Amino acid sequence: MATVKNLRIGKSPNRLIQDLDVFDSPSAGWNDPWSPHSSRYHWQLHSNLGESAVFDENDFWCVCQKTRKHLHVKVRRDRGKPLIEEPEENYGIKDRIPVYYEEEELPEPHVTSPTKSEFATTSTCMKWSSKTTKSEIEVEWRDSYLDANCIKEIIDSRRPSFASLLTKKSSSHQGSSHSSQPSLFTTFTSLELFLRNVLVHNDQRAISAAPEGTFERHVGKGRQIQSLMKSLLFEYHHENVNYVPTIADAPLTDEQKLNLYLARNELIVLANHFRDTKEDPAIVANPFPVRLARPALINAFGVPNYDSVVPMYTTVFRDNSASLPDDPAFIALGITNDYPDSFVRYFYEEQKKNDEANVRVYADALAHIYNLRKSSFLRDLIAADRKNGIVSSDVIQAAYSSLGLEAEVGPDYRYSQEKIFEAFHSALLRKPEFARAIRNDLETIGYARKSSEILNYVLSTEQAFYTVNEAYQWLGIKSNTEDAMVASVALVKFEDDSDKAIEAVKWIAEERNSSILYDFLASQGRPSNKKPKEVPMDEDLAYNTLGVQDRALSDDVLINVYGFAVEDHPEQSDTLRAALKCIGEVRNSRLITHYLEHGNLDIPPEVSSLDTPIGLENTGNLCYLNSLIQYYFIIKPLRNAILDIDENKDLNMIENKEAVKKVGGRIVTRIEFLRALQFTYELRKLFIELITSKSSSVHPSSVLTYLALIPLTLDQVKSGTSSVMDLSSSRELSNLNERSITIDPRAEEQAQGLEQEQGQDEAKSPAEQSSSVNLIDFPMANTNGESQTQPHYFEVSEEEINSSMDLGRQQDVLECIDHVLFQLEASLGRISNSEDRLGSDNDLIRRLFSGKLKQTLNDASQGVRSNYEIFSHLIVDLFEEKQTLYDALDGVFETVNIDMGSETAQRSLCITELPIILQLQIQRVQFDRTTGQPFKSNAFVEFGKELSMDRYVEDTDGKMAPLLQRYWDLKREIINLQKRQQLLLTTNSNLMSSVDTLSILSKWAAQQQDSRLPINPKLPDILQEEINNVVAEVDMLKKQEASLKEERTHLFDNYISHSYDLLAVFVHRGQASFGHYWTYIHDFENNVYRKYNDEYVTVVDESEIFADTTGNNANPYMLTYIRKEYRHIIECVHREHNLLL
């Protein structure tokens, strides 16, 4: 703890009010946070009963309900009432909140008295002033005027004796009895009335004290009453048996008036204290309503409005309903526990500025408050103070301890600078993995000692990383991450800090001695001074190093063996790499060579072939967009609509500046349409390259990427002018205006006849089906051979593309899909071409991808009601580490009970219309509430080549009702069986199941047979029998579960009216915040699966697609299925070199 030197704490209004409940005179306690701060006083305002004066909010008296002590508060302001609202941006706190400092010179009491009265009260005064609000607060305390002993004797005299309590009879037997003495409430109420008449009405008449008279019945008699009346300036006359005012012949002095005023309010406190309606039924209404002083103090002292961090505390403070103990740290800063962080900072800065000798004390208080709250705001404040050399005592203590030294206090330091450095370097040698923390400790000592030598040393030797683990942590990867992935992640981190990313890779490259990472550094123009050492290797040593005995292993299996070996022994990565390289050279393996150079197995075709799709190059972490473009390209009607956009675009939106259209239930503005049209033209350009290029891969344009990923801002949509080309002089537009658009009234009929056409189509031969598809005539050149330029509707500058921070980041794939489909749907008009038998394609996108859901709610108050919703994808959640796709879909369509507030409703979901292409998104990115961070679920989802949706489609005729009931009943039975198994196999705190526990207990009981413990000799047998019972029941439950699952799996085998075939599998490898995307697509025509991995498109074995991915972070995040009767619209290979000019 820091050394304290006469603290002078500036107090907030809240703190000062709290302290008035504790202290009652000038003392050290006001500025001692560690002194007892328990509440002693509970103030109420003096009563104004019978007075006509208006309450003065700047000058008022209070009396304590506990001690009957008095508090006089006077507030002076130079410029009116200070603002007390919470500070806003650009308006300083100092202009709104008073900070009160105690004045050294105390004011004199404000009572003048010509003569000293034997009943005069003692008083003490204090004064505080606030420069921030130019206000002063003066407080005077006065002791209780009424003699405490006298009051005690009166109270004691009214208490019934023990004997009277024993002889007292029930009022039900002898009627109500009246005590010979008046109640205490009556006594104090009557006395208050006498004083009120004197003070308010100047009533100076004598008061008769005749036996059994009014005074005796209401006040009492005896020595104590006479003494009390004397203090109230009434003298008892024996001869006349009355009380005569002692001030009848002269006006009251100021001191007498004040004393009687104080006495009157003390009598009110006493009367309220002894008010008991049960003992005295005559008491009904309270003549003295209590007004607590807290609201008046809050108003007078300028308590601000603020967002309390402890609302319960604030409520109690404002209501003054209970004692509020405060932490010494808050007291040290002159605040209360509920002040928000911004106020904490303000008062902390005030204390430092006005009490520089005790800065460390206030820093300690701030550190303690941060430890209580753990807020980033206070953490940053502490960090900023650290840069100014202000460090808390506990941090200094910990810093010295870290270096193996005892903490010291200046200015006479026991350790020399050389000793400090010696301890620092010793600590680094002992714990190099904690280098950063140890350096921070040295810096802390430098600040504490105000040593420029230490601080300059720390600054001059600063590095981005001090351990390789820090490099891994900054990149957000694990130590076993492959070299190629390390380089990929580093490229992503370039956007945050390219220099730091390079430094991180250097650390990892040197720790692994990785040639891949050294080459990466060289490619970025940052070669490392270190180079990978050459490891001598021959063929025999290479196989032995990898632990491979079968030299006939294929290249891909050998690469997997190498990968596992590096993961298990990363410190040997260089030797293992040399072994794989040696084997690759001996085999002349193109696959191994490619893997060592690029870190993947995707070998591009050596020569572009018309039988192979073209890949898309990835230059900015846009692999997910590449996957999406390839997916849309293989859907023939969508591809044709885009390629023939000149014929299919919405001319009305081009020609009519006021035109609008609806997409997805919302209005599309003209600027949105023109932007979408430009996107479709850019996509057409890329599609043409995918068809005509002789290269194995092509590069998507930056404009296409920008338009696909970056939506219009709200301001751009409202303005309607951003980047829109002037179409009035467009030659292309004038040509379009000559065309006419025919709206086909039979569109609905064609859509309804879709199924019939499909049946007719299946009767055709493959050759006939192929001939029915016309080759697109691309408008690439006119009759004169001149190149035709692509029309421009929306201008995107290079500056816009380069300045877009989102362009190179991995976006949410679902958002990207929605944005791309929205632009395609917005740009297309009615399509007259029905060659793919999709009907009148007024809404091609919706016909392909959209279905309709029906949600039904059933509750007691409103009965059954339904609503419908269009969907383009279904999101399925992951419930277990392993599940089937049907299990995941069950979670979407299962009937559940939902809370509707006042009642519970049953909700069911079904499909009324199915899309041609069904898109299922697997919800892999989830949120960890403990860490507050997103994470990726790698749970395995088992899916097949086929998917039947019959069980999820609306059962309109009720024929499937019994089957559906059985389906869901089986699921509930399976869950009950699983719960029972879980109960039997639940582990205890030592991770032992009930069977293990019983087994150990049985062995222990058997070993105790010869001991003196009173153990039943049959206990081991009993326990073993119980073990057998548990094992037998678990086996039975597992068999039952397997049987029910088997029945449930095949329950709908004969229901295939709504059957789908697997079309595409979108895969993500990595974590929630980074990774790589690729897609598997099923080529139905050639019956192969291809892997679309950026520029590499390769045929893969289907086992790679359907493999169990448990424990692997490369897994599907979206599955798409196509209805069996529409497989003909998928054309994966569409190449034609002759179209290239």
UniProtKB/Swiss-Prot annotation:
GO molecular function, one term: proteasome binding
Pfam families: RPT, UCH
Protein origin, superkingdom: Eukaryota
The keyword Hydrolase appears for this protein: yes
PROSITE patterns according to UniProt: USP_1, USP_2, USP_3
CDD domains in alphabetical order: Peptidase_C19J (cd02666)
Phosphothreonine modification, residue list: 112, 115, 721
Positions of modified residues (Phosphoserine): 113, 722
Keywords, in A-Z order: Hydrolase, Phosphoprotein, Protease, Thiol protease, Ubl conjugation pathway
GO process annotations (BP): negative regulation of ERAD pathway; proteasome-mediated ubiquitin-dependent protein catabolic process; protein deubiquitination; ubiquitin-dependent protein catabolic process via the multivesicular body sorting pathway
Active site (record annotation): 623 (nucleophile), 1076 (proton acceptor)
InterPro entries recorded: Papain-like_cys_pep_sf, Peptidase_C19_UCH, UBP14-like, UCH_repeat_domain, USP_CS, USP_dom
EC number: 3.4.19.12
Residue ranges annotated for the USP domain, each copy included: 614-1124
Catalytic function, reaction form: Thiol-dependent hydrolysis of ester, thioester, amide, peptide and isopeptide bonds formed by the C-terminal Gly of ubiquitin (a 76-residue protein attached to proteins as an intracellular targeting signal)
One term under GO cellular component: cytoplasm
Membership in a protein family: Belongs to the peptidase C19 family.
Protein name: Probable ubiquitin carboxyl-terminal hydrolase 2
Chain's gene name: ubp2
